[in-house]
């Protein structure tokens, strides 16, 4: 009986060992592996809405256009710019702040110091720090009672508009990206440019 039990256990142990070895190193065999791509590339997961390659293309065009105008290129001192919110009038619930964020970082990087931006979105933290200095709670390298918060020379803002068509044949979306640089003193639009992108496809995609 002991010999018979041993003969049964050995094959079962070997089978379990082989199964365990076979399962090691197998990663998502039935799925599609993740592919790392550049932000300006279009992948196989795509829709007719605003995507990363659109954001890169549009903001790159706007940066080149802004830096070429006389108010920036020929300014005696670097103009100070404040970002105003981008209005989204398309059907896509996108993070519209990404446009301003990339515009600002690319302008700072490529302008060679010809433009400056104010961190108005951080005003609460800045005012708190200023008050702490005025109260003597923290050190100050200059007179904390002097008003040093700067005003803007220009506001940079934009609008996204769209037209959509949907039939049994598929979906089509046209998006107009328009941006403006507005003189903060006179309200004059000193610069404006736009980009147009149209896409069509068989299926619609969900955007978050």
Which role does the model predict for each range below?
Residues 15-40, 44-45, 207-208:
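Bacterial Sec signal peptide processing site at the extreme N-terminus
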Residues 36-50, 79-89:
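Acidic/histidine-rich, surface-exposed loop or edge segments in extracytoplasmic proteins
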Residues 48-59, 92-100, 139, 168-172:
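Solvent-exposed, acidic/flexible segments
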Residues 61-66, 80-85, 137-166:
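A short, hydrophobic beta-strand-centered structural micro-motif
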